[in-house]
From Swiss-Prot:
This is RNA-directed RNA polymerase L. It comes from the Viruses. NCBIfam families: paramyx_RNAcap. Residues 596-782 form the RdRp catalytic domain. Keywords: ATP-binding, Host cytoplasm, Hydrolase, Methyltransferase, mRNA capping, mRNA processing, Multifunctional enzyme, Nucleotide-binding, Nucleotidyltransferase, RNA-directed RNA polymerase, S-adenosyl-L-methionine, Transferase, Viral RNA replication, Virion. Belongs to the rhabdoviridae protein L family.
C-alpha cells in the first residue's frame, strides 16, 4: 500500500502508473502546439531521458532544433538531472525586489490580507480536540511557532515558490502563443513571439527561457539548458524538501516524540546531495540502496541468539560491488542512523525519493530485459510436480473451508487406501499432517470446470480510459504514412472500444483458449516506468486492444473467482483487512510463548522477467481447468513469444513492417521473447509464488503467515518447541534450534526457487525477529512505526494529474494530509501544514491560477452569482470580500458547495457517513475558540446556507448526503458533462448496441426519470440511490464516468475548447465564493447540528430526506475524565498506568481499536448470489435484499425494486428475496450510502489505544438491545480514544484515568423510524429496458452458475423441501436456538460477536441453553461425528456463564466449576462437562436451515428423536455418512430398515436474533447470602516454637475451596463488624469480589470497595462494566479501581482480600489470608487473629500489620495449631446452605488445585469415579489446548489436585508422603487412566506411586491442534508442583 495512494492496492498503483505514462506524447500533428494539454505538466510524470533518447522523439527533436536556432544551445550546454536538482534545491537565487520573479510574486502575495487569520484558525482547530493545549495555544503562539519554523526553512520556501511559478507559467504557454502575448502584468515575465518562449527574470544574472519541452537558463555569463522534465523533477524535489523540512522543524518546536530533527534531516539529505554531486547520474545506484540500508540498520538490532546473521542486509548493502564507488556515502548514512531509534529510522526511510530520479538508460533497460529473457529455464521436474500437487492441496482445502464441499474433480485411479481419495469421496476435511496423508496421491486427482465466465462480461466490463498499443496493421500504417508510432485514436482504449464489434468475453476467451489470438493483435509496446531510482530503465507494457482485453479479463477472473481461495495473497484486501493482517503477522514476533516467530522478506531477481511457460504450467493449466479452458492461462507465455515487442515511448528507430507492424531489428523491437512482462499476469504469477513458498514451509513443519502481492512476499514462520527461562528469554538450546531452523529454511528458499528458475537475491532475502515491512509499512516488535514524511512531502497543490482547479488543488492537499495522518500519531502538526497549504492555494488561485490565467489576466472577479429566496442575484465583489474567500478555502466543506478542505475530525477518522453534520458540528465547536470577533463572524457564516432556485434531483440521488446549495458547477463536473454530451451525440461509435445505450444520456429524458424517482412525499434517498444505480441510467452514466482523462475528452470533443469551458466555470466559482456570504443566507443553523443538517436537507430539496443524517460525536458527546471510578451513563474508556511518550513506544494489554466495517447481518439468497456474478445484474440483484428488509414484499416500493431486475433480465425475481424471518440488522446502520460496506476506521497510528480498554455497554441509555438510533458508534469510540490518547501522550506522570463520552446534546440522538411506504413510494411505473442489447440485457438461459452456486442452490431447494415449520414466535424458544448457536460456535462453524453473546446472556436461561448444546455435543460424540466436527473453542460458553445466576444454575445442574475469573477478563470454567455422556437428556432438537451445517443439524436432530437410532450400529453408520455428503435429496431415510424415525424434526428458517432479541431482558441478578450467622469474636493467637526454615503446614492448609469458603466468609464478616474499616481492597478475582459483596449485603453495609485490577483483557468487550452491572445497586455505586484511588485510601483503616498469585502488595494494614495466601504473611511483621469458632475445616486468618511486632509467620503457624485443636461446629454448618447450592461467588472453585471435589478414595467405585472425572478434565484440555505452555500448566493443575487428593485420603501423613518423588508422565492422546498406589508392593514403580495415562496409539505423539507435533513429558515431584512458580 502506497501512502501517496492509501486506498489503492499495489496492482491498482501499477495500473495508475501505466495510465500516467500512457497519455504521454500521444499527439504528434503539426498543430500540436496549438492544442492545449489537458492536464498540464505540473510535476514529473515520466522517466527522465538522456539527450540521445529524447532527440529520437520527433516532437522533442523539433523543439530542440528550434532552441538551437534561437538560443544557440548545444549538447555540451545541457544540464544533467543532478545539476538541475542542485540548482533548484540549493542554488536558486532569491531576489525579493519588484521586477524579478520572486519579488513580483511576493508583492502580490503580501497584498492579500488576512494572513493572520490562519494563526487564529490553527489554534482554534487544535483546541477542538486537544484539551491539553487550551492554555498556551493562542494565535500569537501559533504565529511565533510558524515564524520560527519558517525562518529555518526560508530558502526552501522561496525556491519552492519560484519553481512552482516557473512550472505554472510554462503551462500557460500554449494558450498565450495563440494570443501572442503574456497575460501577466509582471515586469519579470515576458512572452517572446519570435522564439515562442516565456522569458522570466529571476535575478540580474539569472534569466529563464521556457518553452514546451526545453528550458534555457542564462546564469551569469553561462547559457545552460535542460529538458522540461528535468525542471519538473527539480521543482518536485524542492517542494518535497520544503514540506519535510517545515514538518520536521515544526515537530521539533512541538516536541513530538521520536521525530527526525531538522538538523538530522538536513544531514541525511546532505549525504545524498554530496553523493549526486560527486557521482552524477551514477549516484542514483547509491541512492537506490538507501531503503535497503535503513531496513538493514533496524534488522541489525535483532536478537543475535536467534537470527543467524542479523547484519546480513546492512553488510551486503554496504559491500555490494555496485556500490563500491559510493560506499563512503552509505557509511555516512549508516553512521547518522546509529543513534536513532527504529521509529526515527522508519521516518527517514520515507525520504528515498527526496533526491529525485536519474536519467534512465532506455537501451540498457531493454538489453537487461532481453538478457534475462534469454536465459533458458530448465526447472527440476520434481519441483514442478510438487508445485502442481501443492496447488491442488491448497485450493481443495481452502475451497472446502469456504463452501463445505470440494470443487468438482475427477479421480482417475481411485485408491481405497488413499487418505486423500477417501476424504474427497466422503467430503471429509483434509488434514495434511496425519500420518496416512500421501502427497503423490494428488497426481490422480484432476480439477474440472468449477467457474463460469459471466455472460455479461463484454467490452463495457473492461471499458476504461487507459492507454493501449496499436495493432500491427495500425502501427505499420502510422509508421508508413507519418513516420511516427503515435496516434490518439490508436492509443486510447476508450476510443478503440467505440469502433469495436460486440465482444462477449465468454466466447472471446473460449476462442483464445482454442485458437489463440490473431497475429495482428500480438503486439506489446514497452516504455520506461517513471519515479524509479534505477538507471537502467524498468519497462512497463502496453498491449493491443484485444491482447489487453485478454489479460485484463483473465486477471479479473482470477481476482473475482480464485484469489479468495488463497488468503495469503493480499492484492484484493480492503484497507482495514490489510491493516489487521499486518498487525497480526507482525505481532506474532512478540508472543513470548513456547514458540518464536521470525519474518522473512523475499527479494526476487527480476521476478516478472524470470517467468516462463514451463515454470507456470503446473499452476496455469489447473487454473484454466477451473474455467473449463485448459489453455486459457497456459497460453500466456505463448502469446508473449509470438508477439512483436517494441519501444512505444518514441525514442527508438523503428521501421514499418507489413507483417510485424514494426520491423524486428533486435534493438528497439524484437520477437520470440517468452519471458513475463511487468504487470501483465501479476495475479497468476503471485499464485504460483505463494504455492511454492507454502510447499517449502511444509517441508520444515513450521506455521507460516504469508502476505504476498507480486514479487513483494513477506512471510512469518513460527518455530515451536521453544523453552524460555524465568524472565521469558529463550534458553540457549532453544536459540540454537531456532537458528538451525532459520538457516535450513533460508537455504531451502534459495535453493528451491533457484531450481525452479525464479532466483532470489541471497544477499537481500533477509530475516528478522522484530522488523516487519510490507508495501512501505514498517512494524517493529509488533508496533507500526511512525513514518509520515513520505506523504507529507507530497502535500502541495500541484501534486497530481488532475486539472488544476481550485477545488482539485485543495483536494490534493487534503489527500496528502489524510495519507500522512495514517502514519502519524496525532493531527496537531498536520493542522499547521494543511492550513498554510490551503491558504497558499487560495492565494495562488487569485494571482496565478493555473487554469484561468491561460485565458484572462489574473484579477479579482467583479461579481459573483448567488441565490437568495429562490432567485439568482449578481453580487458585486471587491477586495473587502477576501476574508470570507480565504476562510472558505481553509475551512470550507464540499458538501456545502465550498472547496473540499479537511477538518481535524475528518483527518483522524475514515468512514463517518454524514459530511454535513461533520462540518456543521466542527464549525460550531471551533467558533468557540476563535479569538478575533471578525473572523468568528466570518466562520459563523460557513454553516449558513442558501438554496438553489432549481431542484436537480439527479444530484441528490447520485450523492444522498448532498444538499441543494447555490454553488455553480465546476471542475470535474464539467468534464463529466462533456463526456456525456459526446457519447450522446457521437458518430464515432459504430457499434449499434453501444449507440443505443448512449441514447439514455439525453438530459431531458434522464431528468424526467430522476423527477419521477423523487416524486414521493418523502425521499428514502439511500434506496433511491441504489435504484438509480441499478437502472440503465446508472449503468450508462458509469460508462461515461470512465472517460475521465482530459486528453481523451479533448480528443472526443474536437469542436469544443475544453479548457476554456473549464476556465469559465472556475472563474464563476471563485466569484461565487467571494460573494457567497455578503448577503444574509436563506437558512441559518440551530443549536444542534443534527437538526440543522436535517433542516438544510429537507428545505433545500423541498421534501423530507430520510436516513442520511447522523450526529457527529464532536457535538453529540462531551468528553470528560476522572482519576476516580465514577460510572456515568456514557461510553467509558479506562487507561492503564502508562503516560507521556511511553504510550507511543510500548504495547499495552488492551485490545487495539482498529475500527470496523459494518456488514450486513444476512446473506442474499443462493440464486441471488449466483446471478450477482453478472456485471449487468450485480447492482439490481443486490438491491433485491431490500425487499422484506426495508420494504415488505408486495408493497408498491418492493415492486419498483423488483422492476430494476425485470428491466435487465427475464429471470423470476421471487427467488431473490429473503423472508422477513431470515433478515436481521437495521437497514440504516448496516447498509452504506453507496450500498457498500460502511463503518469507521481510525486514521492515525493506533498502537496507543492498546493502553486503553473501552466499552459502549456502559452507555445504558443507548446500549445493545435497545432502540434503533442514529448513532455511529465507531466514530464515538474513535473520538473518545483519540482525545484520551493524545492527552495522556502529552502529559507524563499521569495516574490511571477513566474517560467518558457522555451525551451532551439532547437533540442529536433520535430513534430511527421505519419509512412509511405510502409517503416514500415514488410514482415510477416503468424503467428503461433494452431487450436484445447484450450490453444492457441478459436472458436467464445465458446465466451459467459456478459449481458452488449450483450446489448451494440445490441444497437450498432441498432445505426448502425439508422445512415443515413456519415461525409463529412460539414453536422454537430462545433457549433452543441459543443451544444450537452455542454448539455451532463450539465446533467453529459459526462466528458470533462477543457483544451478541452478552445480549444472549441477559435474556435466556443459561442452563437450559447449555443442555441443548450438550445434547448435541454428546450425540455427535456417540455417533462418531466428533472427529469431523471437533470442539474448536469454548470461549462462548465461558462468556455465557459470566453471571452469578448462570453459573449457579449450571453448577447445580452440570457440576460446572469456575477455574478462574477476574473483573476485567471474565471467567474461565471447567469444560470437562463437554465430555460427560451421562448428561444427555431426552429432548427434541430443532434445525435452522438459515445457519450452517444443515446436514449435521439434521443428523443430530434425528439422533435425538430416537433412542433406537442411538444404539443401532447400522443407523449410526447411515447418520454418520449424512453430514459429509454434498446433497441431501438422496437421503430421505435416516434409519436402517428395521427402525423407523419418529415424527420429523422441527425445521425452520429464521435469523437467530429474531428469536433471542425478542426475549424480555432479565434485570434481576441477585447475590445469594447463604451464611446469615452472626459475626464471631476474633482472637489473637500465640507464637509457636517452630523454625521458619522448616515450618510445614498441615493438611487442611490444602483443603478444597468448599471447606475454605465458609470460614473465609465468616472471617471477613467478623472483621468488618469488629474493626473500624473505611476501605476494602479486593484482588481482581470474581469469586473474591462477589464474596465481599455478599458479606456487605449480609451486613447491610456500604463500604468503598477498590478492585486491584492487574491489566486489560484484550477482548472486544469490557468485562469490568458488564460484571459491575451484576452486583447489587448499593454495592455497585461504591466500587472503584484501586490504582486510580490509592492516594485516597487510609492504610490503617483498610483491609485487603488477596488472591494467591498477587505479587504486588497494596496499602492496607489489615489482610485477610486464606489457603495459599499464607505465603504473603511470611515476611510481614504483625499479629494474627482468628475467629473464636469455626464454620468449616478451611483456614482463614486476619493479619494486622504492626511494624513493631516480629514476623507473623510464627503466629500463622500457631493459628494452624489452634485450628487443629478446635472442634468443627457441625451443627452450625448443617444449619445453613452448603456450598454446592451457592452461586458462583460461593459455590465454584477458583483453581483446580483447590476445586476438584473428589469422592473419597476408600472404595474401588470411588476410585473409578475419580479416574473418570480426571480423564474428562484432561480430555477437555486436549480438545482446546491453546499453546503448549498453557496446556502443560492446565495439566499440572489437574494432576496436582489428583495427587494431593490421593495423599490426603490414602495416607495418614500428607507431608511425609509428599517428601517422596511422585512422577507424572503424559504421552499422546488419552484413552485410559490407571492409578497405582500400593505402599506395600515390592514393585518400585508401584511403591513410588506413579500415575499412568495410557496413550491411544502405540508410540504416537500427542498432537496439539495447529501446532508442530511434539511429545510433552511432565516429570515433577509434588513439592515442585506445590512450591514452584505459579502461572495461571
Amino acid at each position: 500500500m502506497d501512502s501517496d495512494y492509501p486506498d489503492l492496492d499495489p496492482e491498482a498503483l501499477t495500473v495508475l502508473d501505466s495510465i500516467r505514462e500512457g497519455i504521454q506524447d500521444e499527439e504528434e500533428e503539426d498543430n500540436n502546439d496549438k492544442i492545449l494539454s489537458g492536464t498540464g505538466d505540473y510535476h514529473l510524470k515520466s522517466a527522465l531521458r538522456t539527450l540521445d533518447d529524447m532527440t529520437r522523439h520527433p516532437i522533442f527533436n523539433k523543439e530542440y532544433q528550434k532552441a538551437v536556432r534561437h538560443f544557440g544551445i548545444s549538447p555540451t550546454m545541457m544540464m544533467t538531472p543532478t545539476a538541475v536538482l542542485k540548482l533548484t534545491v540549493s542554488q536558486t537565487k532569491i531576489n525579493k525586489a519588484v521586477g524579478f520573479l520572486f519579488g513580483d510574486i511576493l508583492v502580490r502575495l503580501d497584498s492579500l490580507p488576512w494572513a493572520v487569520d490562519c494563526y487564529d484558525s490553527i489554534q482554534a482547530e487544535i483546541k477542538t480536540m486537544h484539551s491539553h493545549m487550551m492554555i498556551f495555544a493562542t494565535p500569537s503562539w501559533v504565529e511565533d511557532v510558524h515564524n520560527k519554523v519558517s525562518s529555518l526553512v526560508e530558502y526552501d520556501h522561496d525556491a519552492t515558490l519560484i519553481w512552482a511559478t516557473v512550472i505554472t507559467l510554462k503551462n500557460y504557454l500554449p494558450a498565450w502563443r495563440e494570443k501572442g502575448a503574456s497575460l501577466l502584468d509582471w515586469r519579470s515575465v515576458q512572452y517572446d513571439p519570435e522564439s515562442e518562449y516565456l522569458v522570466m527574470k529571476v535575478d540580474r544574472d539569472f534569466i529563464i527561457y521556457v518553452g514546451s519541452d526545453i528550458c534555457v537558463m542564462e546564469i551569469g555569463k553561462q547559457t545552460l539548458w535542460a529538458p522540461v522534465p528535468y525542471i519538473l523533477n527539480g521543482a518536485d524535489k524542492v517542494a518535497e524538501r520544503y514540506n519535510v523540512k517545515y514538518y520536521c522543524a515544526l515537530c521539533d518546536e512541538l516536541d513530538i516524540p521520536d521525530r527526525i530533527s531538522l538538523e538530522k534531516l538536513n544531514q541525511i539529505i546532505e549525504v545524498g546531495d554530496d553523493c549526486l554531486q560527486a557521482l552524477g547520474n551514477k549516484g542514483y545506484d547509491i541512492i537506490g540502496s538507501y531503503e535497503a540500508l535503513l531496513a538493514g540498520i533496524i534488522q541489525a538490532r535483532d536478537n543475535p541468539q536467534v537470527i543467524p546473521d542479523r547484519e546480513l542486509l546492512q553488510r551486503t548493502t554496504l559491500n555490494d560491488p555496485g556500490n563500491t564507488i559510493g560506499v563512503t556515502f552509505l557509511k555516512r548514512w549508516d553512521a547518522l542512523m546509529e543513534d536513532l531509534n527504529p521509529e526515527q529510522i522508519a521516518c527517514a526511510h520515507g525520504l528515498y525519493r527526496i533526491w529525485g530520479h536519474p536519467a534512465v538508460d532506455i537501451l540498457g533497460g531493454i538489453n537487461k530485459m532481453r538478457e534475462v529473457a534469454s536465459i533458458v529455464k530448465l526447472p527440476s521436474s520434481k519441483i514442478l510436480t510438487d508445485i502442481g500437487r501443492q496447488f491442488k492441496e491448497m485450493f481443495f482445502t481452502s475451497y472446502h473451508s469456504v463452501h463445505k464441499h470440494y470443487p468438482k474433480h475427477l479421480i482417475r485411479e481411485y485408491k481405497s487406501d488413499s487418505y486423500i481419495h477417501e476424504c474427497l469421496k466422503d467430503n471429509r476435511t483434509l488434514n495434511s499432517k496425519v500420518l496416512s496423508y500421501h502427497f503423490p496421491d494428488w497426481d490422480s486427482v484432476a480439477l474440472e470446470k468449477n467457474f463460469e465466465v459471466p455472460y455479461s462480461w463484454n467490452l463495457v466490463h473492461n471499458l476504461k480510459d487507459k492507454a493501449i498499443s496499436p495493432s500491427r496493421s495500425e502501427l505499420y500504417e502510422t509508421l508508413s504514412t507519418r513516420n511516427s508510432i503515435f496516434g490518439a485514436s490508436n492509443r486510447r482504449g476508450i476510443l478503440k472500444s467505440l469502433t469495436m464489434e460486440t465482444v462477449q468475453l465468454r466466447a472471446f476467451l473460449q476462442d483464445v483458449n482454442d485458437k489463440g489470438l490473431p497475429d495482428n493483435d500480438k503486439i506489446i509496446g514497452v516504455y520506461p516506468k517513471e519515479r524509479e531510482l534505477k538507471i537502467k530503465a524498468r519497462l512497463f507494457s502496453l498491449m493491443s486492444f484485444k491482447l489487453r482485453l485478454y489479460f485484463v479479463s483473465t486477471e479479473a477472473l482470477l481476482g473475482d473467482k480464485i484469489l479468495k481461495y488463497f488468503p495469503q495473497i493480499t492484492m484484493s484486501l480492503d484497507m482495514l483487512s490489510m491493516i489487521k493482517k499486518m498487525f497480526r503477522v507482525s505481532g506474532q514476533t512478540t508472543r513470548g510463548d513456547d514458540s518464536v516467530t521470525v519474518i522473512f522478506n523475499l527479494d526476487f531477481v527480476k521476478w516478472n522477467l524470470q517467468m516462463r511457460k514451463i515454470i507456470c504450467s503446473p499452476v496455469f493449466t489447473q487454473l484454466g481447468a477451473l474455467f473449463g479452458m485448459p489453455n486459457l492461462f497456459d497460453i500466456t507465455h505463448d502469446l508473449f513469444r509470438e508477439s512483436v515487442i517494441y519501444l512505444c515511448s518514441g525514442e527508438g528507430d523503428l521501421r514499418g513492417d507489413p507483417v510485424f507492424g514494426v520491423a524486428p531489428d533486435g534493438v528497439w523491437s524484437w520477437t520470440g521473447d517468452e519471458s513475463g512482462k511487468e504487470g501483465l499476469r501479476q495475479k497468476g504469477w503471485t499464485i504460483l509464488t505463494v504455492v511454492t513458498i507454502m510447499l517449502i514451509a511444509k517441508r520444515h513443519h513450521v506455521d507460516v503467515s504469508l502476505m504476498g502481492g507480486g514479487d513483494n512476499q513477506v512471510l512469518g514462520i513460527t518455530i515451536g518447541g521453544m523453552v524460555r527461562d524465568s524472565v521469558g528469554e529463550l534458553t540457549q538450546d532453544s536459540c540454537k534450534l531456532a537458528q538451525c531452523t532459520i538457516k535450513r529454511f533460508t537455504q531451502d528458499l534459495i535453493t528451491t526457487f533457484g531450481d525452479l528458475g525464479l532466483p532470489l537475491k541471497a544477499s537481500e532475502t533477509w530475516v528478522s525477529d522484530s522488523l516487519f515491512m510490507y508495501n512501505k509499512h514498517m512494524f517493529y516488535k509488533g508496533m507500526p512505526l511512525r513514518s509520515p514524511l513520505k506523504a507529507v512531502s507530497r502535500i502541495f497543490p500541484l501534486a497530481n494529474d488532475s486539472i488544476m482547479t481550485l477545488d482539485n488543488m485543495i483536494n490534493n492537499i487534503s489527500s496528502g494530509v489524510k495519507a500522512a495522518c495514517m502514519k502519524e500519531r496525532h493531527g496537531i502538526p498536520l493542522v499547521f501544514i494543511k492550513t498554510m497549504a490551503y491558504r497558499r492555494v487560495a492565494e495562488l488561485s487569485l494571482i496565478m491560477h493555473p487554469l484561468t490565467v491561460c485565458f484572462k489576466k489574473p484579477e479579482l472577479p467583479d461579481h459573483g452569482i448567488v441565490a437568495r429566496s429562490g432567485k439568482k442575484l449578481k453580487i458585486p465583489v471587491t477586495s473587502k470580500n477576501l476574508r470570507q474567500y480565504f476562510s472558505l478555502c481553509t475551512l470550507g466543506s464540499s458538501t456545502m458547495g465550498h472547496p473540499g478542505t479537511l477538518h481535524l475530525p475528518d483527518i483522524i477518522m475514515r468512514g463517518f457517513p454524514d459530511p454535513l453534520t461533520s462540518h456543521l458540528s466542527f464549525i460550531s465547536e471551533m467558533r468557540r475558540y476563535i479569538v478575533d470577533p471578525g473572523l468568528a463572524s466570518v466562520v459563523d457564516k460557513l454553516s449558513h446556507l442558501s438554496t438553489s432556485p432549481t431542484t436537480e434531483y439527479a444530484k441528490l440521488v447520485e450523492d444522498p448526503t448532498s444538499i441543494n446549495h447555490d454553488a455553480p458547477t465546476h471542475g470535474l463536473n464539467e468534464i463529466r458533462q462533456m463526456s456525456r454530451d459526446f457519447l450522446m451525440s457521437t458518430t464515432l461509435a459504430t457499434n449499434p448496441h453501444l449507440k443505443s445505450l448512449f441514447s439514455l444520456l439525453d438530459r431531458g429524458t434522464e431528468k424526467d426519470f430522476y423527477d419521477a424517482l423523487c416524486s414521493a412525499q418523502e425521499l428514502d434517498v439511500k434506496v433511491l440511490h441504489e435504484i438509480a444505480g441499478a437502472t440503465l441510467y446508472g449503468y450508462t452514466n458509469g460508462i461515461a464516468s470512465r472517460i475521465d482523462q482530459t486528453g481523451t475528452v479533448r480528443a472526443l470533443n474536437e469542436n469544443i475548447d475544453v479548457l476554456r469551458r473549464l476556465a469559465l466555470a472556475e472563474t464563476r466559482y471563485i466569484g461565487y465564493l467571494m460573494a457567497r456570504d455578503t448577503r444574509e443566507h436563506d437558512l441559518k443553523p440551530s443549536s444542534c447540528s443534527r437538526i440543522t443538517a436535517q433542516q438544510y436537507r429537507d428545505l433545500s430539496w423541498r421534501k423530507p430526506i430520510l436516513g442520511v443524517t447522523v450526529p457527529h460525536p464532536m457535538e453529540m458527546c462531551q468528553i470528560m475524565s476522572s482519576t476516580e471510578t465514577i460510572y456515568h451513563d456514557a461510553v467509558v474508556c479506562w487507561s492503564d498506568r502508562v503516560s507521556g511518550s511511553e504510550i507511543y513506544q510500548s504495547m499495552g494489554q488492551g485490545k487495539i481499536y482498529q475500527g470496523s466495517y459494518t456488514k450486513e447481518r444476512f446473506k442474499a439468497t443462493d440464486i441471488a448470489a449466483a446471478y450477482g456474478n453478472e456485471d449487468i445484474l450485480v447492482k439490481a440483484v443486490r438491491l433485491q435484499k431490500l425487499i422484506n428488509w426495508r420494504y415488505d414484499e408486495g408493497s408498491n416500493f418492493a415492486k419498483i425494486i423488483s422492476l430494476t431486475l425485470e428491466a435487465i433480465t427475464d429471470a423470476n425475481t421471487e427467488g431473490f428475496h429473503r423472508s422477513k424471518e431470515e433478515i436481521k440488522g437495521e437497514f440504516d446502520h448496516r447498509r452504506g450510502v453507496t450500498g457498500d460496506i460502511s463503518g469507521g476506521i481510525p486514521n492515525f497510528l493506533v498502537t496507543p489505544t492498546s493502553h486503553f480498554s473501552s466499552t459502549t455497554s456502559s452507555w445504558v441509555s443507548h446500549s445493545r438491545g435497545g432502540k434503533n438510533e442514529n448513532i455511529h458508534f465507531q466514530s464515538v469510540l474513535i473520538n473518545l480514544l483519540y482525545r484520551a490518547m493524545v492527552y495522556r501522550g502529552s502529559v507524563p506522570g499521569l495516574p490511571e484515568m477513566i474517560w467518558y463520552s457522555k451525551e451532551k446534546c439532547s437533540d442529536c440522538i433520535t430513534e430511527i423510524k421505519d419509512p412509511d411506504p405510502i409517503k416514500t413510494t415514488p410514482s415510477l411505473h416503468t424503467l428503461p429496458s433494452a431487450k436484445g442489447n447484450p450490453f444492457a440485457y441478459i436472458e436467464s438461459v445465458n446465466v451459467k452458475l459456478d459449481y458452488h452456486h449450483q450446489i448451494e442452490i440445490t441444497k437450498g431447494m432441498e432445505e426448502e423441501y425439508l422445512i415443515n415449520s413456519l415461525w409463529d414466535g412460539q414453536n422454537v424458544s430462545g433457549e433452543e436456538e441459543s443451544g444450537l448457536l452455542l454448539y455451532l460456535m463450539l465446533i467453529g462453524s459459526r462466528q458470533i460477536s462477543e457483544s451478541f453473546i452478552l445480549l444472549m446472556r441477559e435474556r435466556i436461561n443459561a442452563a437450559t441453553a447449555l443442555q441443548y448444546m450438550l445434547n448435541r455435543v454428546i450425540l455427535a460424540r456417540k455417533l462418531g461425528l466428533d472427529s469431523q466436527f471437533p470442539i474448536r473453542s469454548t470461549s462462548c460458553v465461558n462468556l455465557l456463564l459470566g453471571t452469578d445466576d448462570n453459573i449457579l444454575s449450571c453448577r447445580d445442574r452440570f457440576n460446572i466449576e469456575l477455574l478462574s475469573g477476574s473483573w476485567e477478563s471474565g471467567v474461565s470454567c471447567d469444560m470437562s462437562v463437554l465430555y460427560r455422556d451421562d448428561l444427555l437428556t431426552a429432548s427434541e432438537l430443532h434445525v435452522n436451515v438459515y445457519l450452517q451445517n444443515v446436514p449435521l443439524q439434521l443428523a443430530l436432530s434425528r439422533a435425538a428423536s430416537s433412542t433406537q437410532l442411538q444404539s443401532c450400529l447400522e443407523c449410526q453408520a447411515i447418520v454418520l455418512d449424512r453430514p459429509s455428503q454434498r446433497e441431501l435429496m438422496r437421503y430421505l431415510h435416516w434409519c436402517c430398515p428395521y427402525h423407523t424415525a419418529n415424527a420429523p424434526p422441527r425445521i425452520l428458517r429464521i435469523h437467530s436474533e429474531k428469536l433471542i432479541k425478542g426475549i424480555e431482558l432479565r434485570t434481576d441478578n441477585p447475590l445469594l447470602v447463604p451464611y446469615v450467622c452472626n459475626p464471631v469474636t476474633l482472637e489473637r493467637v500465640e507464637k509457636v516454637p517452630v523454625m521458619v526454615d522448616s515450618w510445614e503446614l498441615p493438611v487442611h492448609m490444602h483443603s478444597t475451596w468448599d471447606s475454605i469458603l465458609p470460614q473465609l466468609y465468616l472471617t471477613l464478616k467478623s472483621l468488618l463488624s469488629q474493626v473500624t474499616i473505611s476501605s476494602l481492597i479486593v484482588d481482581d478475582d470474581i469469586t473474591l469480589i462477589n464474596l465481599a459483596a455478599s458479606v456487605m449485603l449480609d451486613l447491610r453495609r456500604e463500604l468503598p470497595v477498590y478492585i486491584n485490577v492487574k491489566g486489560f483483557s484484550g477482548t472486544e468487550i469490557n468485562n469490568k462494566f458488564d460484571n459491575l452491572k451484576l452486583l447489587p445497586p448499593n454495592i455497585r455505586s461504591s466500587v472503584s479501581v484501586y490504582h486510580e484511588n490509592r492516594s485516597l485510601i487510609e492504610a490503617s483503616a483498610a483491609v485487603w482480600l488477596p488472591e494467591p498469585s498477587s505479587v504486588e502488595s497494596v496499602g492496607a494494614d489489615w489482610l485477610v489470608l486464606w489457603g495459599d495466601t499464607w505465603r504473603m504473611g511470611a515476611g510481614v511483621p504483625g499479629h494474627v487473629l482468628v475467629t473464636e469458632s469455626k464454620l468449616s475445616t478451611g483456614m482463614a486468618w486476619v493479619l494486622h500489620r504492626d511494624p513493631l511486632a516480629s514476623q507473623s509467620v510464627l503466629e500463622l503457624c500457631g493459628a494452624v495449631q489452634i485450628w487443629e485443636k478446635k472442634a468443627l461446629d457441625w451443627d452450625m454448618r448443617e444449619g445453613h446452605c452448603v456450598p454446592i447450592q451457592m452461586n458462583r461467588t460461593l459455590a465454584c472453585s477458583r483453581l483446580g488445585s483447590r476445586g476438584v471435589r473428589w469422592t473419597m478414595w476408600s472404595t474401588a467405585a470411588g476410585l473409578d469415579k475419580v479416574t473418570r472425572i480426571l480423564r474428562s478434565k484432561l480430555l477437555s484440555l486436549s480438545g482446546n489446548p491453546g499453546s503448549s505452555y498453557h496446556w502443560r500448566k492446565g495439566c499440572q493443575k489437574i494432576l496436582k489436585a489428583y495427587v494431593l487428593s490421593l495423599y490426603a485420603h490414602c495416607v495418614d501423613n500428607m507431608l511425609e508422603a509428599s517428601g517422596r518423588l511422585v512422577g507424572v508422565s503424559v504421552h499422546g492422546s488419552l484413552s485410559g487412566i490407571v492409578p497405582i498406589c500400593d505402599m506395600h508392593s515390592s514393585d518400585r514403580i508401584q511403591r513410588a506411586q506413579y500415575l499412568f495415562l495410557k496413550e491411544r496409539c502405540q508410540g504416537g505423539p500427542f498432537i496439539l491442534r495447529n501446532r508442530l507435533e511434539r511429545r510433552i513429558n511432565l516429570l515433577s515431584p509434588v513439592h515442585d508442583l506445590l512450591d514452584g512458580p505459579s502461572q495461571s
